[in-house]
């Protein structure tokens, strides 16, 4: 008996779904914030959070596991050299999903997925606040 497993099919074949989530993971690691539909954002959160947890311990085996999922060397390097050390003390909850209303063409619910306490943003906000004073 199948029973429910909490997987969103997103109206795609399994290979298309895996490739889409892989591309979205690479984009989120590279840009640290992406805009997508709400169901895709919720599914992305399920796959990116374990990747960041994996990056908190830098080892060859963990890098190979990450590369097996991401398939992009630059993303793996940033994940282990920047994001892993940045989130080392955070026990989980590395992403934030902000609802952005509805898309004009098809009224699909849109969302902004971003990394919590993004490494580049905190220093820029502090610098701009001190520059204004």
UniProtKB/Swiss-Prot annotation:
GO MF assignments: structural constituent of ribosome
Family matches, as SUPFAM superfamilies: Prokaryotic ribosomal protein L17
Q: Which domain of life is it from?
A: Bacteria
* A GO biological-process term: translation
Q: Which NCBIfam families match?
A: L17 (TIGR00059)
Assembly and binders: Part of the 50S ribosomal subunit. Contacts protein L32.
Q: What is this protein called?
A: Large ribosomal subunit protein bL17
Gene name, please?
rplQ
């Amino acid at each position: 008996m199948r029973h429910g497993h909490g997987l969103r099919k997103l109206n795609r074949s399994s290979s298309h779904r895996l490739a889409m989530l892989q591309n979205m993971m690479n984009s989120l690691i590279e840009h640290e914030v992406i805009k997508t539909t709400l169901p895709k954002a919720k599914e992305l959160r399920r796959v990116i959070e374990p990747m960041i947890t994996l990056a908190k311990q830098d080892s060859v085996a963990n890098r190979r596991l990450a590369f097996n999922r991401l398939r992009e060397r630059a993303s793996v390097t940033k994940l282990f050299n920047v994001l892993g050390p940045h989130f080392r003390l955070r026990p989980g909850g590395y992403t934030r999903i902000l609802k952005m209303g509805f898309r004009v063409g098809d009224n699909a619910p849109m969302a902004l997925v971003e990394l919590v306490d993004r490494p580049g943003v905190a220093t820029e906000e502090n610098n701009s606040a001190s520059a204004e004073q």
